Amino acid sequence: MAEEKWVVMVTAQTPTNIAVIKYWGKRDEVRILPINDSISVTLDPDHLCTLTTVAVSPSFDRDRMWLNGKEISLSGSRYQNCLREIRSRADDVEDKEKGIKIAKKDWEKLHLHIASHNNFPTAAGLASSAAGFACLVFALAKLMNVNEDPSQLSAIARQGSGSACRSLFGGFVKWNMGNKEDGSDSVAVQLVDDKHWDDLVIIIAVVSSRQKETSSTSGMRESVETSLLLQHRAKEVVPVRILQMEEAIKNRDFTSFTKLTCSDSNQFHAVCMDTSPPIFYMNDTSHRIISLVEKWNRSAGTPEIAYTFDAGPNAVMIARNRKVAVELLQGLLYCFPPKPDTDMKSYVLGDTSIVKEAGLEGELPQGIKDKIGSQDQKGEVSYFICSRPGRGPVVLQDQTQALLHPQTGLPK
């Protein structure tokens, strides 16, 4: 390491995920070990993702991190756990183009710069910490030449944010709670890839992009301490639902999938209500969206849309296919129209081709009106995001997408 001015960087993109069988409650707060298994769908990173650039240089005097342009402290135990675990697995790195060699032993004394950016609101119930920690671990593993598979890396990401372990894969992912005290068997595994059930379309109603009043971490702790329903859920309900959900996903059985997804979301929020003091993540708009979907499915005579809510008011709706998704978007925009000064481009994000197909000029077709009922459900929706099941994390080769300057390792 004779030349002291060099900077080596890696930029990665990692998706977020939405749980269809929920994780709520830890049996070990430090290692972040859950009280039950969970299953999630990974969202297309083109629509919802974290971008992270990690850099190493002998000129850096300490580890530093910038999140969405603001420097944040890395002193928290979750960041420290992830950094320690990755550093302990680092290997020799050689950049022949730049003539740089980093020996395995050098990683202990070299410092890192990390810049991370979410393309969606942080801490508003859209699993930003999941994508964030998954991206951090994935990018650092690439930078340090860590030779471990995604499941092994998921055990490290889990120590930053529980649901982060599920963002290291695309498609549908299961987080095994594991039984060992050290957490070595509490890892994520891919059930199916993103092509297995690619008919599905996901529409998210961002009801509020403000930070929530009760964080997931404190909410879970209070539920574990006070909710009898949570104990029953973890022991009796979830193990059965996990098996049923795996079967539904394998067989692309949308009827079973919808029943399980909606029931599990509702039970999770019932647990929050059963917590002392009760936790309210959903609001009136969330409840109106549930009513809309329930009425829609009854009117259709068969489940066409599943809904699920994480620890926040945002509704995640999963449509059986694109035709249903187009009709659903029409209905949602009829019920929750944008404010007069908001244009459609900033009101419907993600896969905007659905907006074109929805043909939003003119009157709503009567068939859709029948499915959603009267237009008395106006509520505060900030915007919608259209997405689909997506792939896992990738390294971005295009250096123009890096968040750090290649010469200085400081934010651009």
UniProtKB/Swiss-Prot annotation:
It is an enzyme of class 4 (lyase). One of its GO terms (molecular function) is diphosphomevalonate decarboxylase activity. GO terms for cellular component: cytosol; peroxisome. Performs the first committed step in the biosynthesis of isoprene-containing compounds such as sterols and terpenoids. Is specific for (R)-5-diphosphomevalonate (MVAPP). The catalytic efficiency with (R)-5-phosphomevalonate (MVAP) as substrate is 10000-fold lower than for MVAPP. Can complement a yeast mutant defective in MVD activity. PANTHER family: DIPHOSPHOMEVALONATE DECARBOXYLASE (PTHR10977:SF3). Homodimer. This is Diphosphomevalonate decarboxylase MVD1, peroxisomal. It comes from Arabidopsis thaliana.
